[in-house]
Swiss-Prot record:
It is an enzyme of class 4 (lyase). The lineage of its organism: Bacteria, Thermotogati, Deinococcota, Deinococci, Deinococcales. It comes from Deinococcus geothermalis (strain DSM 11300 / CIP 105573 / AG-3a). The gene is murQ. PANTHER family: GLUCOKINASE REGULATORY PROTEIN. This is N-acetylmuramic acid 6-phosphate etherase. Homodimer. Pathway: Amino-sugar metabolism; N-acetylmuramate degradation. Specifically catalyzes the cleavage of the D-lactyl ether substituent of MurNAc 6-phosphate, producing GlcNAc 6-phosphate and D-lactate. The active site is at E90, E121. InterPro entries: Etherase_MurQ, Glucokinase_regulatory_CS, MURQ/GCKR, SIS_dom, SIS_dom_sf. SUPFAM superfamilies: SIS domain. Residues 11-24 have a biased composition (Basic and acidic residues).
Length: 305
């Protein structure tokens, strides 16, 4: 009997395929297993490399909205949702990005971060409702992730966000999927079949993580969150970061440890402010005014263009 095209037995998604090279996986010893899994991760890097033009277009499209005070709204389910939460959460300590401007939405809510919530990803209306409840609007940028490219929760969120005027960026690991068609900025991460068939927490997830790192980091750089390649907007919240702030300030200004400590104390721990203070001989309030006039860009505040 012929299997109809709609049958799950004929799933066309590459991430659901059986990898022909690893059919004896359960017979391998630990060393061989580790080699197989690590070698396969290289496909994730290559998939992201192939997506560089699409990632760059997404950065260019997102920047104007974020410069006007818009938010990053992340949407995903399962592994993709957890990666979305991770990227959104790390923007504040790394770049002092306001937490209210990084909004992660995961199918099933916060409980889904730690455990699977059955059926949550199949609810398109829940995705749309979550986007509306987050107050998504024309200034915002929605980043949607789904390895399959077909997750109803994510598709519902993207369609709702577009209707509300938000910019939509869609990352999927299968070509020709609804998510890539629905998003204004589609990004294909074509990783192919997994070593363990269908386990997209493997290289599909790795590719998504690399792409998210790239996308959000590039945005933060263009928004003035670094000076050179120095993390001058780091949010000092523990001893390790306090030491990092001191080291960065000394490196960027040539100041002594004592001078850098004093400037950081006056600047409330803000490296960027201390940098401008020490380089231009300004007080903390004067440095803050200069930075505000420069749109938060240290290089512009220093008159370096």
């Amino acid at each position: 009997m012929t299997t109809p095209p709609s049958s799950p037995l004929s799933d066309p998604r590459r991430t659901e395929g059986v990898h022909p090279t690893h059919t004896d996986l359960d017979r391998l010893d630990p060393l061989a297993l580790v080699q197989v899994f690590t070698d396969d991760q290289r496909a994730a890097v290559e998939a992201v490399r192939a997506a560089v033009p699409a990632l760059a277009r997404a950065v260019e499209a997102a920047l104007p909205r974020l410069e006007r005070g818009g938010r990053l709204v992340y949407v995903g389910a399962g592994t993709s949702g957890r990666l979305a939460v991770l990227d959104a959460t790390e923007l504040t300590p790394t770049f002092s990005w306001p937490p209210e401007r990084a909004v992660p939405l995961i199918a099933g809510g916060e409980r889904a971060i730690r455990q699977a919530v059955e059926g949550a990803e199949d609810d398109a209306e829940a995705g749309a409702a979550d986007v509306r409840a987050a107050g998504t609007g024309p200034q915002d940028v929605l980043i949607a992730l789904a390895a399959s490219g077909t997750t109803p929760y994510v598709l519902g969120a993207v369609r709702a966000a577009r209707a509300l005027g938000a910019l939509t960026i869609g990352l999927a690991n299968n070509p020709g999927t609804p998510l890539l068609a629905a998003a204004e900025c589609p990004i294909l991460l074509d990783t192919g079949p997994e070593v363990i068939s269908g386990s997209t927490r493997l290289k599909a997830g790795t590719a998504q993580k690399i792409a998210l790192n790239t996308l959000s980091s590039a945005l933060m750089v263009r928004l003035g969150k670094v000076y050179g390649n120095l993390m001058v907007d780091v949010k000092v919240s523990n001893a390790k970061l306090e030491t990092r702030a001191l080291r960065l300030t000394c490196h960027a200004t040539g100041a002594s440890e004592a001078e850098a400590r004093a400037a950081l104390a006056q600047a409330g721990g803000r490296v960027k402010t201390a940098l401008v203070m020490l380089r231009l001989g300004l007080s903390a309030p004067e440095a803050e005014v200069r930075l505000q006039a420069a749109g938060g860009h240290a290089r512009v505040a220093l008159g370096e263009g």
